[in-house]
């Protein structure tokens, strides 16, 4: 059944109920090799022009799944069959927590937007570690998005990130430090330069310690930032990835926004806004980060991608890779293959020989 036929049925359900059903279906599919192969044939696009390498990892294509969908690594075995070049699970907190009261997810089909105030619900890092340990391998890179528990005081936030890192160190290909969700009280205060530098120093030290202890390279550390920062903040954050001893190896830009477009007054629920209204705001942050880092630091662009043109706009702004989530709600899983099949034509039409030459050209 095509997603166009299925979507009206899914949209009669509570958004969180629809999400739970999709996770359950993919979790079951992960145990069905023949089913996975059929799904992969339908949704996977193979094109060597899309392949890139960052942080010592190979990305067969630049389109990943953003954190927020597979919070507890239940669907991780099946998700590569949908054509993603990489998967980011989480957000994972060190201890289980229920998140914020329901309802906490709201669809706006006319605006192709979602507002959520989830608050990092999840089973905790130990449960996620057990599931990831059971995977037979990583056909695509797997990132793990880390957050702090709601009841952990801000002054002890670094303890939560380090605790989660210690539990998950062996099971991800990169780690993302999430200090930008608007749905955990005070979390965005950790984006302040002094607090952020202290947090990242603690996480980087733990990463190096674990690498030495287990005689393996440290994990690439990425930082996920909000779209609501000004250019001075972005310049300061960009500096954390520069120099001889960078505290982070890349950025994910951006999380959801707390701002509401004046042109769309119907987006009234509190929480983080994602989807189409976030596209331009996210792109502006990507471009500023690209300039602040002189294009030397990989950026994963996320926010408002509903087409290949949207993904390409993020690459032009300076993104090396992109992620989708809200776009899948409105366009379905075929969005990934559509982007991958159309991207080369977009950069060739603009006269670029490859993806790397297109990157950052409008920043």
UniProtKB/Swiss-Prot annotation:
Compartment(s): Cell membrane
EC number per UniProt: 1.3.5.2
Pathway: Pyrimidine metabolism; UMP biosynthesis via de novo pathway; orotate from (S)-dihydroorotate (quinone route): step 1/1
GO molecular function, one term: dihydroorotate dehydrogenase (quinone) activity
Residues noted as binding substrate in the record, renumbered to the chain: 71, 116-120, 178, 183, 255-256
Cross-referenced Pfam families: DHO_dh
Cofactor: FMN
An annotated GO cellular component: cytoplasm
Keyword Oxidoreductase: yes
Membrane topology: Peripheral membrane protein
Catalytic activity line of the entry: (S)-dihydroorotate + a quinone = orotate + a quinol
Cofactor-binding details, from the entry: Binds 1 FMN per subunit.
Keywords, comma-separated and alphabetical: Cell membrane, Flavoprotein, FMN, Membrane, Oxidoreductase, Pyrimidine biosynthesis
Residues binding FMN, per UniProt: 67-71, 91, 145, 178, 224, 254, 275, 304, 325-326
Primary location: membrane
Keyword Flavoprotein: yes
Catalytic site positions: 181
GO biological process, one term: 'de novo' UMP biosynthetic process
HAMAP family listed in its UniProt record: DHO_dh_type2
Functional description taken from the UniProt entry: Catalyzes the conversion of dihydroorotate to orotate with quinone as electron acceptor.
Quaternary assembly: Monomer.
Family: Belongs to the dihydroorotate dehydrogenase family. Type 2 subfamily.
Protein name, entry field: Dihydroorotate dehydrogenase (quinone)
Species annotation: Acidithiobacillus ferrooxidans (strain ATCC 23270 / DSM 14882 / CIP 104768 / NCIMB 8455)
